[in-house]
Amino acid sequence: MTTDTTGRTGNPAAAASPERFRYGFLKGNPQLTKNGELKHLLSIEGLPRSIVNHILDTAEQFVSVTDREVKKVPLLRGKSVFNLFFENSTRTRTTFEIAATRLSADVLNLNINASSTSKGESLLDTINNLSAMHADLFVVRHASSGAPYLIAEHCAPHVHVINAGDGRHAHPTQGLLDMYTIRHYKRDFTKLRVAIVGDILHSRVARSDIHALTTLGVPEVRAIGPRTLLPGGLEQMGVKVFHNLDEGLKGVDVIIMLRLQNERMSGALLPSAQEYFKTWGLTPERLALAAPDAIVMHPGPMNRGVEIDSQVADGPQSVILNQVTFGIAVRMAVMGIVAGNND
């Protein structure tokens, strides 16, 4: 038995088989206070629809802030936000930093490679030391599923935690910004058919999107991909599974494309990228199978010529760059809700 960076023995992701959709460390709902208010954002799973809608409604208000000449509000003035990214990130880290700055927070980006964790310090010891510096909010991305839960469980009572992606488990702010994007273009969730396409097995975004879509009442969620890249447990959540892209895309209103997460694959699950594109790539011809006003989304990073054709990515039905723009407002909303009150 080994000791990992969290300070615990064993594998931090061992609570769940990678083939299953749900994770075993979700006990109760540690992200809510006794009064049902949001203290941490760790997962969309288990969040009441009212809280999800409250976040989306609050984000709507912050969209106008991003369009102003002075793009700041004083909601987190005097608060310290620590961005702790133990995995690489461009969009998520940058938009969290922009969001915190626009809320007037003091922002610190921890250089993980130069931190004491690279010298063997456990994750919890790192968190305890940063808490002693009077941190108010930790934004955490970690390769181990459940790491943000561990931090939320052991951090000081006044500290809030936002999960910016943990292993294969969850990426709740991406899920929320995806829901905001869908609501912006489609308005009524209860009349939609949404397809998620690609490497769903390794995708924390897919898990968060599926939980969010079902919470918001989407009547038909489709998971489309090779058998080797689809987790078990999807049908039990009411998700329709397709192993043929053309069949799965027929009549859908929203298409969410996912990249191949080769860094999380332990074996040869697929042929070459070229062969993958022939079978699973979203081309203009395949997009034509969807509803005429369907929108195309992608959480990024995007691999052109692998899961999506450039004509689609840059075409009139693509809202991919708008997702990034909306992500700032959504992350402002999340940080404002969890840490904006006087603790």
From Swiss-Prot:
Give a single Pfam family match. Answer: OTCace
Which EC number(s) does the record attach to this protein? 2.1.3.2
Q: Which Gene3D superfamilies match?
A: Aspartate/ornithine carbamoyltransferase
Alphabetically sorted, this entry's keywords are: Pyrimidine biosynthesis, Transferase
Kindly give the SUPFAM superfamilies that the UniProt entry links to this protein.
Aspartate/ornithine carbamoyltransferase (SSF53671)
Which InterPro entries does UniProt cross-reference here?
Answer: Asp/Orn_carbamoyltranf_P-bd, Asp/Orn_carbamoylTrfase, Asp/Orn_carbamoylTrfase_sf, Asp_carbamoyltransf, Asp_carbamoyltransf_Asp/Orn-bd
Q: What superkingdom heads the lineage?
A: Bacteria
Q: Which residues form a coiled coil?
A: none
- State which pathway it belongs to: Pyrimidine metabolism; UMP biosynthesis via de novo pathway; (S)-dihydroorotate from bicarbonate: step 2/3
Q: Which residues bind L-aspartate?
A: 119, 204, 259
Catalytic reactions on record: carbamoyl phosphate + L-aspartate = N-carbamoyl-L-aspartate + phosphate + H(+)
Which processes are annotated in GO (biological process)?
A: 'de novo' pyrimidine nucleobase biosynthetic process; 'de novo' UMP biosynthetic process; amino acid metabolic process
PROSITE patterns in the cross-refs: CARBAMOYLTRANSFERASE (PS00097)
**Residues at which carbamoyl phosphate binds:** 91-92, 141, 171, 174, 300-301
Q: Name one GO molecular function term.
A: amino acid binding
**Among the entry's GO cellular component annotations, what is one?**
cytosol
Protein family per UniProt:
Belongs to the aspartate/ornithine carbamoyltransferase superfamily. ATCase family.
Described purpose of this protein according to its UniProt entry:
Catalyzes the condensation of carbamoyl phosphate and aspartate to form carbamoyl aspartate and inorganic phosphate, the committed step in the de novo pyrimidine nucleotide biosynthesis pathway.
Task: Kindly give the PANTHER family that the UniProt entry links to this protein.
Answer: ASPARTATE CARBAMOYLTRANSFERASE, ORNITHINE CARBAMOYLTRANSFERASE, MITOCHONDRIAL
Could you describe the subunit structure of this protein?
Heterododecamer (2C3:3R2) of six catalytic PyrB chains organized as two trimers (C3), and six regulatory PyrI chains organized as three dimers (R2).
Return the protein name.
Answer: Aspartate carbamoyltransferase catalytic subunit
